[in-house]
Amino acid sequence: MKERDSESFESLSHQVLPNTSNSTHMIQMAMANSGSSAAAQAGQDQPDRSKWLLDCPEPPSPWHELKRQVKGSFLTKAKKFKSLQKQPFPKQILSVLQAIFPIFGWCRNYKLTMFKNDLMAGLTLASLCIPQSIGYATLAKLDPQYGLYTSVVPPLIYALMGTSREIAIGPVAVVSLLISSMLQKLIDPETDPLGYKKLVLTTTFFAGIFQASFGLFRLGFLVDFLSHAAIVGFMGGAAIVIGLQQLKGLLGITNFTTNTDIVSVLRAVWRSCQQQWSPHTFILGCSFLSFILITRFIGKKYKKLFWLPAIAPLIAVVVSTLMVFLTKADEHGVKTVRHIKGGLNPMSIQDLDFNTPHLGQIAKIGLIIAIVALTEAIAVGRSFAGIKGYRLDGNKEMVAIGFMNVLGSFTSCYAATGSFSRTAVNFAAGCETAMSNIVMAVTVFVALECLTRLLYYTPIAILASIILSALPGLININEAIHIWKVDKFDFLALIGAFFGVLFASVEIGLLVAVVISFAKIILISIRPGIETLGRMPGTDTFTDTNQYPMTVKTPGVLIFRVKSALLCFANASSIEERIMGWVDEEEEEENTKSNAKRKILFVVLDMSSLINVDTSGITALLELHNKLIKTGVELVIVNPKWQVIHKLNQAKFVDRIGGKVYLTIGEALDACFGLKV
């Protein structure tokens, strides 16, 4: 078909086209001879559908749109409230409780068999949680008991308010690193541990307030500013930084840097290794690290032994503690945890410090922690909810996580969120509901009451080994390779976050990732793609000529589609210049191929992708129209959206182009050439 169109046009192109009307006539003959068009009369029998576009009602203003959305939100709630009023009072109370506390919904159908599964999952979870919580507390520069506190109250609150059945709540490595790396710049935890603890609790309070606000006001889109690629890079960089910091405990080093960048950490390790380090501590830590990693390999290979890697850290703690106690290794340079304060979480409302001179910085750090913690928790929750086949309510998750951190800050807990590694263990152990979190929290509480004295001789190197064993799960090389193959710009955000965390600091890594993500959005807005369209053979479908090389170009017509939702000040001039450039190139190319002068008569602009246009966009369209008219080319508009056609009418642009506005490209070509294409 393409060859027939070209041959027909070639037969006419040997004549010089003196004016537009003659050119149009000759193109019509070419198109008719090609057999790709019906008779002109067939086109005249069709209704003039362009009037539907031009006579459409006025679209709602932005103010009315905002009012409609707010009204719709309130009407939805009002309808729920009215339906609630029709119910008996006891059912009203139950419905309200279920909305706030989902546990009242699923506990009514709770069975003994489900509890057996949750009990096994909760106990398995606790065996992993207890040693990890102690290790993560030391990573956050807090006393070990604060990690255990964080594994008691937040999981209980989440079990009442959360919607995920599998997520395991507690302290995590990345949030612990964020807290220590940013807050120790304000107060040194070594010289002023009480002041540092107050900062941590106040930061946790702010993080919870931000998280709950995101859910209550439906501001979850703020979390999306950290793209998936940025999170992958950030997690990978943070994992390496955390691993390097654990060399202090693994080598038994006393003096260590407070910086988190890789250069400072490696320099500190090198200096310490030349002066003082404990071979006994290193051998002990590496031995149990190998043991934990081997059990993890066995658990992955044999699915029935999923419980083995889960209890391996607890076994490592118990065995190493007995070894140190029996051999008195603590007298030979092996550092131990020593005193861990037991008992129920003490109240800490009085420790929240809102009079500190660092309040502004604490609020900023709280916002960062809130976003990172929510991103991790919601990603984990949605992953496992998808496997189980149910929907996770993102807004309720934000509210639940926010309230658990606010209440956690009142009970000596630091920022908690969902842990991917522990959630995977919880899922593999066969958990049915959030009851597994309750079982885990009760088990940790029992450990706080009864077992803390037994941890006096637990080597710090073992805690470092437990943290190191959890880090490979944070480094997702396969996902990084996948991102590289799919989207190079996303991979740039990944690399920026990774190297930012690794060579600068955690907050710099996050900032780099967000800046690159914004830069991607801005570049796409400034330089949107423009497609040159052609007709698919034997159809009335017009598609991108680069994607589908078999498409047939219509002689004398250039058809463009702008791949952008907005035609605005940021991209209008660029789009105008590129279209004019293509028009000039097309005419030069056609003139080179044939000795006779071949004329472009129409430029058809498909606006089906555009949602809105501003005054700069309209000005650019006017300039494009004026430039095309000077070269004897007419501009035709196709399928503008409601807001777009309204603004073009208001600006009298439709009158300027002679009302050449059509619903489809085919109708535009029919009208231009008087033929049905």
Curated annotation (Swiss-Prot):
Q: Which intervals lie on the Extracellular side per UniProt?
A: 140-141, 188-198, 243-278, 326-360, 419-426, 476-490
| Name the record gives this protein | Sulfate transporter 2.1
Q: Which GO terms describe its cellular component?
A: membrane
The record's subcellular location field reads: Membrane
A biological process from GO: sulfate transmembrane transport
Q: Where are the stretches annotated Disordered?
A: 23-54
The membrane topology term of the UniProt record is: Multi-pass membrane protein
Main localisation? membrane
| Sugar attachment sites | N255
* Span of domain STAS: 548-672
Query: So what family is this one in?
Result: Belongs to the SLC26A/SulP transporter (TC 2.A.53) family.
Q: Where is the composition biased (Low complexity)?
A: 28-44
Side of membrane Cytoplasmic, spans = 1-118, 163-166, 220-221, 300-304, 382-397, 448-454, 512-677
Cysteines engaged in disulfide bonds, as pairs:
none
Q: What does this protein do?
A: Low-affinity H(+)/sulfate cotransporter that may be involved in root-to-shoot translocation of sulfate. Plays a central role in the regulation of sulfate assimilation.
Q: In which tissues is it expressed?
A: Expressed in root cap, central cylinder of roots and in vascular tissues of leaves.
Q: Give this protein's Gene Ontology molecular function annotations.
A: secondary active sulfate transmembrane transporter activity; sulfate transmembrane transporter activity; symporter activity
Which UniProt keywords are given for this protein, alphabetically ordered?
Glycoprotein, Membrane, Sulfate transport, Symport, Transmembrane, Transmembrane helix, Transport
Q: Which InterPro entries match?
A: S04_transporter_CS, SLC26A/SulP_dom, SLC26A/SulP_fam, STAS_dom, STAS_dom_sf
- The membrane spanning regions, by residue number, are 119-139, 142-162, 167-187, 199-219, 222-242, 279-299, 305-325, 361-381, 398-418, 427-447, 455-475, 491-511
Superkingdom of the organism of origin: Eukaryota
One Pfam family of this chain: Sulfate_transp
Q: What induces it?
A: In roots by sulfate starvation or after selenate treatment.
